[in-house]
Amino acid sequence: MIVIKREMYMKRIRPFIGTELIKVMTGIRRCGKSVMLELIKEELVESGISSAQFISINFEDLNFSHLQTAKSLHDEITKRAAEINGKFYLFFDEIQEVKDWEKCINSLRVSLDCDIYITGSNAKLLSGELSTYLGGRFVEFVIYPFSFAEFLELYRPIAPDEPIQKCFQKYLVSGGMPYLANIRYEDAPSKLYLHDLFNSVQLKDIVKRNKIRDVDLLERIIAYVIANVGTTFSATSLAKFLKNEKRTVAPETILNYIRYCCDAYLFYQVKREDLQGKQILASNEKYYIADHGIREAVFGGNMRDINLILENIVYLELLRRDYKVTVGRTGDKEIDFVCDKSGEKLYVQVAYLLASDETVQREFGAYDNIRDNYPKYVVSLDEFDMSRNGIKHRNIRDFLLAEEWN
């Protein structure tokens, strides 16, 4: 298994290692959460802690299939902990498989000298009553598939002579799922792997978890969202589309199904914001897919829809860097991404190529009604700097690889 140090995440997790807070890592299936647990173990060992102090359980491993309830898990841990002297470290992978897991975790936290790390593939892992039960005694870290920079760390050794442009083309179709490095990013095996991953997410994290009976409807909705990443649409417009396919579905049902997909981290919803009225708009959100390589594997057409895929890539990079993101509207103009991190704003427009005066005017003109002094970017595949009027133009590769934006 090829592993890289995911320092962006470790930097955020490191201050909480050894504290009483429960460390929770969430994200789409197979995005690298288990590897994060291994990286944390490595750091603990390097700090002088013996691996004999570790208790690790992967709840998708058949060896632990008997641990299906909070009581059985609690009994197992207390039995194993009795054999360990001093503080011990708990690593639970895919804990959502255990019924009422939060009761066990909270009991372990308050009654034993332990440091707890858990992963899960569902955004609702810590929602509502679960969060209340844990009493805010946790910190959550969302883990994403590889960024372009992380992809390069593993792809460069495989194709050392390829120019950066070719590397980016490979990323456009392969995406950032970590395991692809183990099959050397070869096209056919990668596509097969990603298709299998998609099926696992759909079956285990969406259908099974939410007890969905109409799988055909779910598949149609997923196909529609995948085809329309980065475009605004409403549940009503999707209901009309399905009606044309002889499926009559209430908009509320559609919204529920899309929410289940977002809970499984297959999609991310981006709300629209009226920048003049400073309010979130109630309809016509955009959706992006967790990994554009999955889109290529199950739907195809990433190069055909390259403008949408570039948007998808930039959006995920903004999330990785901890920005809160909305789509901005000012009058009749729309800004792809309005980004906020601790009160510091950033605006980003994404285009394929600035190949005509009309395109240049549209992309740069999106900022005409924005009067503040926060950084404004237009990002595209163009190689030459076309910055103007205080608006910065960046090649998308340079933008993605920059350590910081200012």
Predicted features, each with a name:
Residues Y185-K345:
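Accessory nucleic acid-recognition modules appended to NTPase machines
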Residues A123, G128-T232, Y265:
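Interdomain motor-coupling "hinge/lid" segment immediately C-terminal to the ATP-binding subdomain
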Residues M36, I40:
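Hydrophobic positions on the alpha1 helix immediately C-terminal to the Walker A/P-loop
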Residues I4-G18:
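Pre-Walker A adenine-sensing motif
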Residues K33:
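Conserved lysine of the Walker
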Residues M25:
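Hydrophobic anchor at the beta1->P-loop junction of P-loop NTPases
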Residues S56-G86:
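Short glycine-rich substrate-engagement loop in P-loop NTPases that contacts/grips substrate
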Residues G328, Y352-R397:
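Catalytic cores of nucleic-acid endonucleases
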